Design a protein with these regions (language model features):
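Short hydrophobic clusters on alpha-helical segments that form packing/core surfaces
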Residues: 18-26, 68, 72, 97, ...
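Alpha-helical DNA-contacting segments of helix-turn-helix folds
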Residues: 26, 61-68, 111-115, 124, ...
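Short hydrophobic/aromatic patch on the recognition helix
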Residues: 44-54
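Hydrophobic alpha-helical connector segments
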Residues: 63, 77-106, 129-132, 150, ...
């Protein structure tokens, strides 16, 4: 068992190196700079070694996206747990979501706009995605007729705001007002 455990740890360490390198390159130069060849050069492995861990580039992006979902879950949980008022908790979550998208553009892109092999809203949806969605759902008022649809609408609106802000279509300076209006319009 000792050799198998060691090999498993080494495999996991290589996968972490691959995803860390992909994320670092994407954050510095954009996702177009992330290729299997470039990653292999960065971490000093051959391309076949990378392919032994990940089927293709989309799978690497998907692994980075899973990291992002773990991170955003924690960020949203902290935002939801601060205020005692449910409306303030929803606004806090909305602002935390928008801040996350702004502070981690390459990671956010991997999570929501890049091609990956991740399944959303299906039986095979990874736990990281479901758990992040559940944090959003936890701040949706239980009085909503369909909490899942309300959560999807909240998420879609936040994503739209994040994308518009990222592309410079709307001003960053009015985000607090937009978050308050969104929460008020959807849930009150």
């Amino acid at each position: 068992m000792g050799v198998a455990e060691r090999k498993n740890r080494e495999r996991e360490a290589r996968e972490r190196r691959i995803t860390a390198a992909a994320r670092q390159i994407a954050e510095a130069e954009g996702w177009s700079a992330v290729t299997v060849r470039r990653l292999a050069d960065e971490i000093e492995y051959t391309q076949p070694v990378l392919y032994s861990h990940f089927k293709n580039r989309d799978a690497i992006v998907g692994a980075v996206a899973l990291e992002g979902f773990r991170e955003i879950k924690k960020v949203l949980q902290r935002a939801a747990q601060g205020p005692t008022d449910s409306r303030q908790a929803r606004e806090g979550v909305a602002i935390a979501y928008l801040d996350f998208a702004r502070e981690h553009p390459a990671l956010y892109e991997a999570m929501f706009t890049m091609s990956t092999d991740l399944q959303f809203a299906k039986a095979g949806t990874p736990s990281e995605l479901r758990e992040a969605f559940e944090v959003l759902a936890a701040v949706v008022p239980p009085s909503c007729r369909d909490v899942d649809v309300a959560t999807e609408t909240f998420w879609a609106a936040l994503h739209g705001l994040a994308q518009l802000e990222s592309s410079g279509r709307i001003k960053h300076s009015t985000r607090l007002a937009r978050a308050a209006l969104l929460v008020h319009g959807l849930f009150e």
